[in-house]
Amino acid sequence: MEPQKFGEAPVAMDMPPKVKKGKKPSRKIRALLALIIPIVIWLCLFLVFPYLNLFSYSFWKAGPFDVIKEFNLGNYQKFFSSEHSADPTFFVLLDTLKLALIVTFFTIILSFPLAYFICFKVKRFKQSLYILVIIPLWISYIVRAYSWKIILGSNGILNSFLIWLGVTDQPLDFLLYSQVSVTIAMIHIYLPFVLMPIYTSLEQIPRTLMEASKDLGGNRLKTFWKVVFPLSLPGVISGGTFAFVLSMGDFLAPTLLGGSSSSTMIANIVQQQFGTSNNWPYGAAIGVIILIIVLIVLKVTGSAEKRYSNLDSV
């Protein structure tokens, strides 16, 4: 650098550029991460990893004493070939699907009038009656299922009442330890799960729409079919999905009230494979198949619910 001459203006020296320090995340971002990270960890530990483990098990095979970690499709071949073999698993799945549809249908049929009555006909004790309907959810599942043994048994309340009326001379044996008892118990147990979303949908219907329908000459029946029912369909679909999915995975009701091969459900087969049969890979394969069916149902019902939810904006 040349020395500065006398009388010349001082020359500005080039300063090195300032290094910008990285900005620290704002307080909002840190608070958001503090909320999201625990949720992600929880989902990974209790949802993602278990399902990945189930999926990997389904491609292994059971050995004499332990699981052999060799990739094969034998478990899935065994399941889908059970239609033509002595293994009843495929037919049990079909029976489970049929029973789940029956339970879903009757829970909707019974829940809708009750939810409609509480929502539109009860004025003073609406909340009290609603709480009374969902109180069974606070009672143990086993207690609710076992109570039907007392009601449907040979010396139970229903048979004693029918004999007293003179309808029959002896107890009706088909009421207990059959598919009838399993179906009745499951309808009773899952009824609150269907009623709650239906009631919520009915409560959200603007009363002005119903009044407008009446002003335009619509009677009660026409108002119901043209206004109330279409706007309540999201709740009906949501409740029906609850009933179907829960019915697909139920194994306690068939165990306590079934007592025969005709009332065995697919969840009982899975329980048996992980229990007495000690064939975890085959049980995992059945679990994956059930999971795929449930995901398909959730996709279809979710699309339908979204479609009918758009009616609110029409």
Regions found by a protein language model. Give the residues of each.
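Transmembrane alpha-helices
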Residues: 37, 41, 45-47, 135, ...
